[in-house]
Amino acid sequence: MMDVQTVRRGNAVQSLMSKLILPLVMAVAFALPARAALQIDITQGNVDPLPIAITDFVGEGSVGADMSAVISNNLERSGLFRPLPKASFIEKVSDINVQPRFGDWRVINSQALVTGQTRMEADGRLRVEFRLWDVLGEQQLTGLQFFTTPDNWRRVAHLISDAIYKRLTGEDGYFDTRIVYVSETGPKNARVKRLTIMDQDGHNPRMLTRGNELVLTPRFSPNSQEITYLAYRNNQPRVYVLDIETGQQEVVGEFPGMTFAPRFSPDGQRIIMSLQRGGNSDIYTMDLRSRQVVRLTNTAAIDTAPSYSPDGRQITFESDRGGSQQIYVMDASGSNQRRISFGQGSYATPVWSPRGDLIAFTKITGGRFVIGVMRPDGTGERVLTDGFHNEGPTWAPNGRVLMFFRETRGAQGGPSLWSVDVTGYNERPSPTPTFASDPAWSPRIQ
């Protein structure tokens, strides 16, 4: 975790450890005619990326250029921005408190401009400031100032990326987040699997388990500080909760028979999962305080892969009770169970969007695995991407982007992580140092 301070000009505001930044509006010291604010409409499907100039932040050493590179990479990968090459820049920014020469930026067709500076304070902290400018409107849109330790510069770059995304799209960014996944090493028939966590852009990977047991389906807690996952030791399934920072973990459930897909409830008080008892696989919840287990489904079918709606009132899951794998929705009490998928093929791994408006899924049809979305009532089904083997969608916290894993064919093939936005137009590989499967996207870091 990092201690970040955010400062309003003339009024310091120190955040507590593990708090996100507070908004900051920098004073604009010059009058401009009122114009419509620069905005990207991300609700209209495929959009032309906004040309944006992101200058190297002014300051000593390489940290300013490094931060600029992280911000450029974040925004470019979103598919909504087109960072312009620095070689095309006419104005060389040396003081961010001086109004830019907007004409120089219009010449290179930039519509937005990011400037910034870094400075080491006498107490050893790193101070970072940035400004976001509307080039055509010739006005400052936002600005923030941070104080942090020098080794946390990368997270500050993610926070700045989120601020830019928010100001220009009107929606929350997702760059100050992490991904937990199962890293896979070794030959295909004897893979060693370890839980690994990394920043959403692939940097700072860190192993969380040693690889001495099979690990599956890691999922974040709502505060992003814990992970629940399934591990097999001596062929016995156990459900764990792992503290990411301390590495401490506890067994919260050890169940006879098969266990699948543990996941936190939105309030973090329960874990929902599929347990096999009496030959049936049904959906159960466990209260993490009392350890009381409650059964929600009771059929002769296989019910698995449960996921709560963001308000905790409903649950989606997969079941073959109708003869093939399909997606169902029920109330959180287990009542009102109904099927919502009716397209061709089989459906699996449903997961509710953080916005509540969509359910993502894996669909197997015609020998191909597709990632798609539908509304919670089953209408509006859309395929986002397909291929030989795509599986395991997980949502970014703003509900605009999904990550999943894709298998490649052959003896040397293996799984890798990919992302795609809800339009299906912006699909990207997500870098990992090893083969990688079963990703889970964190909420915003607290």
UniProtKB/Swiss-Prot annotation:
InterPro entries: 6-blade_b-propeller_TolB-like, PD40, Tol-Pal_TolB, TolB_N
One GO location term (cellular component): periplasmic space
Record flagged with keyword Signal: yes
Subcellular location(s) of the protein: Periplasm
Signal peptide bounds: 1-36
UniProt region (Disordered), positions on chain: 424-446
GO biological process, one term: cell division
Keywords assigned: Cell cycle, Cell division, Periplasm, Signal
HAMAP family: TolB
PANTHER family with a match to the protein in the record: PROTEIN TOLB, PROTEIN TOLB HOMOLOG
Chain's role: Part of the Tol-Pal system, which plays a role in outer membrane invagination during cell division and is important for maintaining outer membrane integrity.
Quaternary structure annotation from Swiss-Prot or TrEMBL: The Tol-Pal system is composed of five core proteins: the inner membrane proteins TolA, TolQ and TolR, the periplasmic protein TolB and the outer membrane protein Pal. They form a network linking the inner and outer membranes and the peptidoglycan layer.
Family listed: Belongs to the TolB family.
Name this polypeptide is given: Tol-Pal system protein TolB
